[in-house]
Amino acid sequence: MAQLYFKYGTMNSGKSIEILKVAHNYEEQGKPVLLMTSSLDTRAGVGTVASRIGMKAEAVAIDEEMSVFDYVNSLPAKPFCVLIDEAQFLNKKHVYDFARVVDELNVPVMAFGLKNDFRNELFEGSKYLLLLADKIEEIKTICWYCSKKATMVIRTIDGKPVYEGEQLQIGGNETYIPVCRKHYFKPEI
C-alpha cells in the first residue's frame, strides 16, 4: 500500500543527493519515477534537482497554481513513485493533492525538504506534510560550529546572522548555515 513520506533536514544534510539516489535505484530496476521540484528554486535552473556534489536531474517544476493530482492522474503511465525536492515550498493544496495521489492512485510519494526556516518557523509545505505524512524521517547533519546535530538554519548577510525578513530567499552555502539550537541563539560569527 502506498504511503506519503516526508524526509526533512537542515541545509547541507544531503536531501537532494538522497532524492537522486532514490530515483536512480528505482530507474535502475526499470521502474520509472516522477521527479518534481518547486519552481521557486532557481539555483540550478527551474525544473532541476541538483546536489552540492554535482549530481543533477531534470524534474517537473511545480508552480503555485499547479494541480499536482491532475498532473499525475493525466500521465499515460503511472509512475512507480513520485519524488519531490524542495517540498517546503509546496502550498497546502499541493500537499493535500499529493495525499490524494497516495490514497486514490496508490502511488507512493516521497517529499524532501526543510522543516523550518531561518526564523525557526515552519514552512507552509512542511507544516502540512508533518500533518499528513504517513512516515516522517529526519535526514541528519552536523552543526557548522560544534558538530552536534544541526536542527536549525541561520541566514547570514555579509557574514552576520539575520533573524528577520522574508521567508523565501533562495540561497546556498553563502547564505544559510546549519546549526544546533545553542549556536542558533549564539552563533560564533
Curated annotation (Swiss-Prot):
Taxonomic classification: Bacteria, Bacillati, Bacillota, Bacilli, Lactobacillales
InterPro entries: P-loop_NTPase, Thymidine_kinase, Thymidine_kinase_CS
Compartments reported by the entry: Cytoplasm
Binding site for ATP: 9-16, 85-88
Gene Ontology biological process terms, A to Z: DNA biosynthetic process; thymidine metabolic process
Active site per database record: 86
Entry protein name: Thymidine kinase
Keywords: ATP-binding, Cytoplasm, DNA synthesis, Kinase, Metal-binding, Nucleotide-binding, Transferase, Zinc
Gene Ontology annotations for the cellular component aspect, listed alphabetically: cytosol
Binding site for Zn(2+): 143, 146, 180, 183
EC supergroup of this enzyme: transferase
The reaction(s) this protein catalyses: thymidine + ATP = dTMP + ADP + H(+)
GO molecular-function terms, A-Z: ATP binding; thymidine kinase activity; zinc ion binding
Assembly notes: Homotetramer.
Pfam families hit by this protein: TK
